[in-house]
Amino acid sequence: MEQLLDILREMHPETDFERETRLVDDGVLASFDIVMLITRIEEEFDVVIPAKDIVPEHFNSAKALYALIERIAEQDD
């Protein structure tokens, strides 16, 4: 989780990603941010995020996003 938080903080250091639960809904993460984030996650965590999983509820919080990463990683094993 800390690795993900580091990535998010690099993008928006002013945001408290440990508490924020509406990153997409409140416009903290815009579409370009999400594209960059997906690229970094795929590189750092060695996963591929399927297009069907690129939905706001997976990107509204670091916790939800990390749960998605873990689920994908488990499926790949």
Which residues make up each language-model segment?
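Glycine-rich loop motifs involved in handling phospho/adenylate chemistry
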Residues: 20-32, 53-61
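Conserved catalytic core of two-component sensor histidine kinases
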Residues: 35
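Major-groove DNA-recognition helix of helix-turn-helix-type DNA-binding domains
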Residues: 49
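Thiotemplate assembly-line natural product biosynthesis machinery
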Residues: 1-16, 67-77
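C-terminal structural segments of small proteins and small subunits
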Residues: 52-76
